[in-house]
Amino acid sequence: MSNISTPQPRIGFVSLGCPKNLVDSERILTELRTEGYQVVPRYDDAELVIVNTCGFIDSAVQESLEAIGEALNENGKVIVTGCLGAKENQIREVHPKVLEITGPHSYEQVLSHVHQYVPKPTHNPFTSLVPEQGVKLTPRHYAYLKISEGCNHRCTFCIIPSMRGDLDSRPIGSVLDEAKRLVNAGVKELLVISQDTSAYGADVKQRTGFWNGQPVKTSMVSLCEQLASLGVWVRLHYVYPYPHVDDVIPLMAEGKILPYLDIPLQHASPKILKLMKRPGAVERTLERIKRWREICPDLTLRSTFIVGFPGETEEDFQMLLDFLKEAKLDRVGCFKFSPVEGAAANELPDQVPEEVKEERFHRFMQLQQAISTQRLQDKIGREVLVLIDEIDEEGAIGRSMADAPEIDGAVYLNGETGVKVGDIVKVKVEHADEYDLWGSRV
């Protein structure tokens, strides 16, 4: 029994960036725990620190470089992975003392480097029990389900393909097995993520896989149909506006998956969309939105846009505002264009001055805030299902079907004590502001 008291080697871990990066962190942490390593929250307790970086925009690069610097100062032994890891020279210029650098989703390389500097412990199942669903960094009641890596698009403002490569879809049986494990472990909401969710299966020509002994096509629609059978909330993120997105709307109307679509549209001027290398048929987009809402009246639409893109005139920007007025999207994120090292858009002529970007950003947000506020006001008096995320001294806080974690609003149940985290309850909406709802259990 002497093995049981052998101290486990201790690893520190810093995870930055988007939910896709979070899933990569979960995978690495699961492998470390499975091999008997202990993951610790303090630099001075760790024998080595792994930093999983983001490199999408300049502020994210800066945050990643600062996190690496902090880990070096506080600990000294650092392995870097993630999107910024694809730019090794950029890291080495600032932090030459980093031990090893790998790009994103290089799980085996990361573990190999860990073994090199902190040898693998004697494996003992009593000290390294790992839940079947793996290590999760989200609360127990929801989880991110990553279905693919990379992207085949070449949007001029984006460098993701240069960091994460072309589309690489996971086998559908593997995705569904993971989803089943998560649900069995108590997950009530699956958030489907990737760089390009609607392209799922395109790289393998939608080949037929197998799950539960049945043939299943590798496609977003087939995946949604199968996930619906698990009896939990299924939420779609990062859905590029391909024509076949129309096919998931009936599934939402039937209650099989959540009536929620995160669909980045980026702009509404055909000229700017062409410069971005994005689909440019704005009238068709408005027609589709109208049709989707006819099929599924409860549909929540979230999108993101970029203002101040090179070449954007006041006329182009006005087209974007007109689009917002007509589309009446529920949730919207807006970014001021900023050059990302390696992005094709940096070389475009007619760069927009910073003060103009700032002014357009504020006009955009002012308009959209009024639209979002009205969309929420319209829910007053209605009954909605709410997934409880948190209990505090004032009551319970949760999310409706219209709210993704981290990025959308919340539903506050002040004074509510009869619920626990992970419960799904019916709530009558009594009050709203521009982001959140307040209500009472029915």
Swiss-Prot record:
[4Fe-4S] cluster 1 binds at C18, C54, C83. GO terms for cellular component: cytosol. It comes from the Bacteria. [4Fe-4S] cluster 2 binds at C151, C155, C158. GO terms for biological process: tRNA modification. It is found in: Cytoplasm. Residues 9-119 form the MTTase N-terminal domain. Residues 137-375 form the Radical SAM core domain. It catalyses: L-aspartate(89)-[ribosomal protein uS12]-hydrogen + (sulfur carrier)-SH + AH2 + 2 S-adenosyl-L-methionine = 3-methylsulfanyl-L-aspartate(89)-[ribosomal protein uS12]-hydrogen + (sulfur carrier)-H + 5'-deoxyadenosine + L-methionine + A + S-adenosyl-L-homocysteine + 2 H(+). InterPro entries: Elp3/MiaA/NifB-like_rSAM, Methylthiotransferase, Methylthiotransferase_CS, Methylthiotransferase_N, Methylthiotransferase_N_sf, NA-bd_OB-fold, Ribosomal_uS12_MeSTrfase_RimO, rSAM. Keywords: 4Fe-4S, Cytoplasm, Iron, Iron-sulfur, Metal-binding, S-adenosyl-L-methionine, Transferase. Its EC number is 2.8.4.4. It is an enzyme of class 2 (transferase). Gene3D superfamilies: Methylthiotransferase, N-terminal domain, Nucleic acid-binding proteins, tm_1862 like domain. Residues 377-442 form the TRAM domain. Its cofactor is [4Fe-4S] cluster. Binds 2 [4Fe-4S] clusters. One cluster is coordinated with 3 cysteines and an exchangeable S-adenosyl-L-methionine. It holds the Pfam family Radical_SAM. GO terms for molecular function: 4 iron, 4 sulfur cluster binding; aspartic acid methylthiotransferase activity; metal ion binding; protein methylthiotransferase activity. HAMAP family: MTTase_RimO. Catalyzes the methylthiolation of an aspartic acid residue of ribosomal protein uS12. NCBIfam families: 30S ribosomal protein S12 methylthiotransferase RimO (TIGR01125), MiaB/RimO family radical SAM methylthiotransferase (TIGR00089). Belongs to the methylthiotransferase family. RimO subfamily. This is Ribosomal protein uS12 methylthiotransferase RimO. It comes from Pectobacterium atrosepticum (strain SCRI 1043 / ATCC BAA-672).
